[in-house]
Amino acid sequence: MTTPLLSVENLQTQFETAEGTVRAVDGISFDVHEGETVGLVGESGAGKSVAISSVLRLVESPGEIVGGEIRFRGETLLSFEEGPNGERRQSPESLSNKEFRQRIRGREIATIFQDPMESLNPVFTIGSQLQEFIEINRELPPKDARDVAIETLREVDIPKPEDRFDDYPHEFSGGMRQRVLIAMAIACQPSLILADEPTTALDVTVEGQILNLVSDLQEEYGTSFVWVTHDLAVVADICDRVNVMYLGQMAEQADVHDLFDNTKHPYTEALLQSVPRPDKTVESLTPIEGVMPEAINPPSGCRFHPRCPDARAVCREVNPEPRNVSDTDTRHNAACVKHDAFDVDYEHSTPIQSEGDEFGEDLQVTEGSR
């Protein structure tokens, strides 16, 4: 087995608030290998964006990474150890924030953010922002950096980049602004790009163009991607493997085809049943009952059990970590005790009501709302 390009183990990021501690990312692990696209999927509030920000060390106060290990090409970027008084602290082998900023962020690991208007400075031209980024990260003189910037804009299919170089962000359409962010991400030819829902604000036609562009660039440069999204159609189109998150934890991890064809976790199944699928014909879609709980006070046991149609009493007691439950040689991890791999006597445990069952008599869903 080859060493992963990126390895994240037991990552924990939390936010201290007046109401208590929000465990936004609570012990997730995943790998990314050379040249592959890995999906990070889940509803809003699952912790996807916080996970990406943690890898990039962009978590803002009052947020803090409090545990886990992140390795890149086998080198430890971040790890923790126990201090003399029992406190958890960064280990000496972790890169300092300055080292990470100078060596890793932008050069080896880049990002594409969701909203270009928040990521681009409105008072500076597109070209000046891209040129400055290249000057800093590739250590090029201004003229050479400008030439590289123009060529990079050309690579992401911005027409006449020499003429658009001195235009401001508001003079570009949403799709074109997203292309500028992609240009900024690939300008230093990084090995890994973390894309945080980069097509969410775009219409379907422009989204398709952006996905095709990313696919072409990946083929040209061999870049790996972590693609954060709630859109399962995008996942099916571009991802090699998928990680499904729920309330700060991993619910399921599998090859993309295996995930869609042989789903192992009730949450993933619920996600798939709530969206149209071209490979299946259904009379109506089934929404996921209830809402995701707050991470400040998660349910006991499995965090999905209050909404799960398969929940039993044991699900209130056991919070399972993802485990291989595959029926084949292909690894397929799921955090659900209904599988024999967990050996908790699920079959003989008493079924419990999900939120949908409990409030079903009062819940009316019209055909137009499905």
Locations of regions flagged by a protein language model:
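P-loop NTP-binding/switch modules centered on Walker-like glycine-rich loops
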Residues: 198, 202-283
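ABC ATPase C-loop
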Residues: 180, 186-187
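Conserved ABC ATPase "signature" region
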Residues: 76, 143-163, 272
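Charged, flexible cofactor/metal-binding loops and thiol motifs
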Residues: 256-370
